[in-house]
């Protein structure tokens, strides 16, 4: 016999999620504290008094006293259990009507395919069977969308699995980029609220560079304080004075080498020496410019990671564009993933990538040997006669905002 219960004990809730293959951060009991501008209901589904599914519902207020239910990366249930699925949908419809919700939107962890880049992709035929079962229960599937902006959550993500991650498993060019950054004086440290100001600074730099609007410092602080023992900031930085001393030593060595040149010295060797000198003098000028402005230690790149169960999520990342030539992003993301695995994670999700698997996101994230995971996408479950009118307006608004 199936039953449901509202506001399940948080400990019972999270323990269930942490042991479920679909368990994820967005369904955790504390996620509603992050999305506190929305309403929230947590409903647990029981079979013979045993918890068999959960749905962390975010409730978006709409005009005229209406609302919309949204269940990010949920509900978390066994979708192959048709009786359970039917009960969950009927329960959600009942709750939605009580809240005057026009529809229930959800995007569960159901994969169409998975695969490492360059290897054969594994298709999941069961997912499409589940889609057909949902359709039989009057749920609308938005389909295999082609544009990232068409979905709330990414339909494709780059997720590193622990067994596929080590320095040796990365490409030669990625390993070289990490070595080069370290040789240029880049250092990395981990922290929390103590690094918040520097991380926020980097995010503002990223906003300016990409001409986009991201989150503010208060939001990042909320993430860190809501998950105090399961969050961390990775920060790469450069000690300008130390780097200046090192480059000046290299220049001194370069000049001494040049003094030994004779008429018999090969032209190529002289040319290489001159090019190196130009590069070193240029970097010295660059560093002194920042030191003269009062800078000493400069943040270069940062990430903010939240952990839940055996998963970790690289939610936000920023970089100081003015120091791009130090190549800080690659070592920062590498250290973030490595630190996550050292802390017990089995997967490290780097977030969404382009649906057509072409572009800057996948080009960068593919450097870390991730598994590319394709989700089934979004479903809409109408719970009001106003659904079709609302959904049309919703799609138009989303299309306009993506321009």
What are these regions (language model features)?
Residues 1-3:
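Extreme N-terminal starter segment of soluble prokaryotic enzymes
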Residues 5-65, 111-113, 117-118, 138-151, ...:
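A conserved beta-strand-loop-helix scaffold within acyl/acetyltransferase catalytic domains
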Residues 33, 291-292, 352, 356-403:
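C-terminal catalytic domain of photolyase/cryptochrome flavoproteins
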Residues 65-150, 298-302, 306-367:
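Acyl-donor binding region in acyl/amide transferases
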Residues 102-104, 202, 234-236, 348-350, ...:
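A general structural signal for short secondary-structure boundary/capping elements
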Residues 106, 144, 191, 217, ...:
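Residue-level detector of family-conserved "landmark" positions at structurally sensitive sites
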Residues 118-122, 156-159, 205, 363-364, ...:
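Short low-complexity, flexible loop/linker segments enriched in glycine and/or proline
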Residues 208, 341, 371-373:
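Bacterial peptidoglycan biogenesis and beta-lactam-recognition machinery
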């Amino acid at each position: 016999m199936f039953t449901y219960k509202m506001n399940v004990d948080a400990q019972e809730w999270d323990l269930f999620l942490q042991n479920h293959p679909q368990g994820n951060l967005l369904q955790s009991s504390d996620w509603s504290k992050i999305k506190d501008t929305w309403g929230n209901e947590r409903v647990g589904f029981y079979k013979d008094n045993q918890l068999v599914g959960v749905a962390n519902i975010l409730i978006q207020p709409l005009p005229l006293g209406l609302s919309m239910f949204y269940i990010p990366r949920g509900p978390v249930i066994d979708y192959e259990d048709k009786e359970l699925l039917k009960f969950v949908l009927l329960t959600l419809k009942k709750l939605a009507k009580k809240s005057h919700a026009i529809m229930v939107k959800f995007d569960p962890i159901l994969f169409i395919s998975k695969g490492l880049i360059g290897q054969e992709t594994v298709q999941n035929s069961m997912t499409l069977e589940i889609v057909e079962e949902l359709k039989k229960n009057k749920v609308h599937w938005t389909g295999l969308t082609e544009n990232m902006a068409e979905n709330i959550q990414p339909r494709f993500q780059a997720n590193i699995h622990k067994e596929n991650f080590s320095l040796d498993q990365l490409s030669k060019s990625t390993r070289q980029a990490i070595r080069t950054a370290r040789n240029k004086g880049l250092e990395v440290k981990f922290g929390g609220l103590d690094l918040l100001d520097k991380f926020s600074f980097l995010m503002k730099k990223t906003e300016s560079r990409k001409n986009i609007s991201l989150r503010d410092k208060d939001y990042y602080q909320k993430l860190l304080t809501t998950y105090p023992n399961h969050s961390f900031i990775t920060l790469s930085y450069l000690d300008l004075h130390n780097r200046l001393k090192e480059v000046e030593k290299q220049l001194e060595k370069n000049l001494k080498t040049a003094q030994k040149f004779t008429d018999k010295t090969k032209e190529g060797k002289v040319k290489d020496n001159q090019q190196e000198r130009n590069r070193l003098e240029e970097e010295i000028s660059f560093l002194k410019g920042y030191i003269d402005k009062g800078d000493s230690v400069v943040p270069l790149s940062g990430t903010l990671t939240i952990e839940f169960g055996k998963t970790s999520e690289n939610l936000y990342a920023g970089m100081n564009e003015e120091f791009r030539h130090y190549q800080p992003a690659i070592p920062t993301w590498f250290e973030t993933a490595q630190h996550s695995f050292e802390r017990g994670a089995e997967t490290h999700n780097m977030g969404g990538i382009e649906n057509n698997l072409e572009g800057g996101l996948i080009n960068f994230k593919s450097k870390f040997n991730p598994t590319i995971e394709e989700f089934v996408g979004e479903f809409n479950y109408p719970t009001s006669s106003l659904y079709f009118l609302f959904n049309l307006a919703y799609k138009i608004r989303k299309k306009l905002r993506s321009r």
